[in-house]
Every structure is written in structure tokens, then in C-alpha cells.
């Protein structure tokens, strides 16, 4: 639902200063983060999309589950239903579609598979055209998710391997933050400012993180 790529959405939030408003791109990133970090439910989705009433979220998800077809068909119906009722809510439609897909597949958490593969032009499609676009998007999104999972596993292993070389007090807690977050600013680490910056520089020098 946004023209920015995933990294640009992330940077819009993490490169902002304390007290700054995140802006549309940062808000989109926060919505996805909140939607994915908890088990899929109407409550967790409302937390991610506070402008949508829980009742509306439930209606869209229920309408998708009432239709014929499998998980992809349900997700396509959710996209169509949300954009029919709220034509500008593209980000919300994608989040709820991936939530519907996760529910249909029995997953606890949503994975942004459709969002990774659907193009803006696809969101203007309806019926069979949208259904086929969702199938194509799922193939693209699943391949990208597998590639990213492999990359993250390798990077996490590398970060754990260099942890014993870190002497700063609190380095273990800092490393845990790097392992569980997409990006971490030095000021967010549980260390004094100078120590946090030195630790980040050390991790970059060791090739364990990227600046």
C-alpha cells in the first residue's frame, strides 16, 4: 500500500528522533510490526490498525471465510471487501488479507506474503482477476520469505558467534535486541550512549551487523 520498499519504511521510523511523528511511511511500518508480533486475532489487528473498528475487522474476515475456495480465495475476498468499503485503505487491506491467509492455513502469526507480491495495479482488480493476482503474489512472496529467512538465519548465527568477543557490560542484552528486531538505533540499547556507539561500531567491524 506504500510506494516505499520495506527498508525505506523501516528507516522512516528508526531514523526519526525521539518525539518525532513517524509520518505515513513510519505508521505503515508500525502497523505491520504490530500486526505480526502477536497471534492473529481481531484484537491484535485492531491494535495494529486502530482507525478500524474491531467490528469492521471481524466483518471483513468473516466475509472472507464465508466464501467458497481455499486460503488464497479468502484472502482475495478480504482485499476486495476492504477496498470496496474503504478505497484508500490499501495498507489495511493487505494486512487483513495476510491475516486471513494465516488463519486459513492455521498459522498463529501472519507473514506478509501477499503484501510482498501484490502490485498497486493488482489492488484495483476485482473478482477472478484479483484472485489470480493473489495466487501469483503468493508465489513471489513465499520465495522472498524463504530467501529472507535463510539470510536472517545466517546473520543471526554470525552475530551469536562474535558475541563472546564483546567485552562491554550489557553486551549480551544488546545482542539479544539485535536478534529480535529488524533495526536497532544505538540510543535504544541498554548501555550508556558512548558505550552503545562503540558496541555498534565493533559489531560493524566484525561483520555481524550492517550500518
Tell what function each PLM region has.
Residues 1-211:
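FIC/Doc superfamily catalytic core
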